Amino acid sequence: MLELDKNTFEAEVLQAPGKILVDFYGDGCVPCAALMPHIHAFAETYGDKIKFCALNTTKARRLAISQKVLGLPVIAIYENGEMIDSCVK
């Protein structure tokens, strides 16, 4: 699983080909921490089919807002630079 930051998000997600799952999480977010092991398990199982990434929104608030991530945790699927689906838990 690739850990993103505000400097790598564009190249690794918005400019990357194919499908990419991004786990938007935050420091101190209990539901985020509970979800993280499941996302890592999916990455191990399906990592050859989809790129798995995570972004700590505590360190990239403006980026999260630009992606319309207003609550946490958010799991988003990107394809060819566009968010095509998302889920807020």
Label every PLM stretch briefly.
Residues 2-5, 24, 36-43, 47-62:
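Thiol-based oxidoreductase modules, predominantly thioredoxin-like and allied folds used
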Residues 2-19:
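A short beta-strand-turn-helix
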Residues 10-12, 60-63:
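Short loop/turn elements that flank and shape the SAM/SAH-binding pocket of Class I
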Residues 19-20, 73:
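Alpha/beta-hydrolase fold active-site loops
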Residues 25-28, 71:
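Short pre-active-site segment immediately N-terminal to redox-active cysteine/selenocysteine motifs
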Residues 28-35:
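Short, thiol/selenol-centered motifs that function as redox-active sites or metal-ligating centers
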Residues 30, 43, 66-69:
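ABC family nucleotide-binding domain
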Residues 71-89:
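Non-catalytic, surface beta->alpha helical segment in thiol-disulfide oxidoreductase systems
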